[in-house]
Amino acid sequence: MMVEKVVGNITTLEKRVPHIERVYMRSDDLVKRVKRVVTDHGKEIGIRLKEHQELQDGDILYMDDHNMIVISVLEDDVLTIKPTSMQQMGEIAHQLGNRHLPAQFEGNEMIVQYDYLVEELLQKLSIPFTRENRKMKQAFRPIGHRHE
């Protein structure tokens, strides 16, 4: 089976179908336009998105009256940073920016992929954080840069 567009997302779907197959993906695979995956029922699927579109957790790749195939994003090993002041937020944002490390934000939390050097830096700066496995809504995107 070849999929060229996303049908919808399960979170906004009004009509439920009786059977759901899942495709488990790492968050960094969500940005790849072309990929081959296998459902939890062993069905092989090719994904070739025509439009430049990033996949998301819950996206429906296929649906009929009896079955749907849905993307489920695997949890990432992340550091959830919880600065207690603007000073701490500024310090860690500056440090992570210098490393060109992609970050995501949810509420008052800054989330980065786990890196032992970042963990050591957070401990050194006494900035509160936790290491956890967390399902991310989108991929951590590499940050392009150049210095002149």
From Swiss-Prot:
Q: What does this protein do?
A: Involved in urease metallocenter assembly. Binds nickel. Probably functions as a nickel donor during metallocenter assembly.
Annotated GO MF terms: nickel cation binding; unfolded protein binding
Give the record's family classification: Belongs to the UreE family.
Q: Which residues form the signal peptide?
A: none
Its GO biological process annotations read: protein folding; protein-containing complex assembly; urea metabolic process
| Entry keywords, A to Z | Chaperone, Cytoplasm, Nickel, Nickel insertion
* Gene Ontology CC, one term: cytoplasm
**NCBIfam families, A to Z:** PRK13261.2-1
Show the InterPro entries listed in the entry.
Answer: UreE, UreE_C_dom, UreE_N, UreE_N_sf
**Domain of life, source organism:** Bacteria
> Which species is the source of this protein?
Bacillus sp. (strain TB-90)
Gene encoding the protein: ureE
Entry-linked Gene3D superfamilies: Urease metallochaperone UreE, N-terminal domain, UreE, C-terminal domain
What name does the UniProt record give this protein?
A: Urease accessory protein UreE
Subcellular localization: Cytoplasm
Stored Pfam families: UreE_C (PF05194), UreE_N (PF02814)
Main subcellular location: cytoplasm
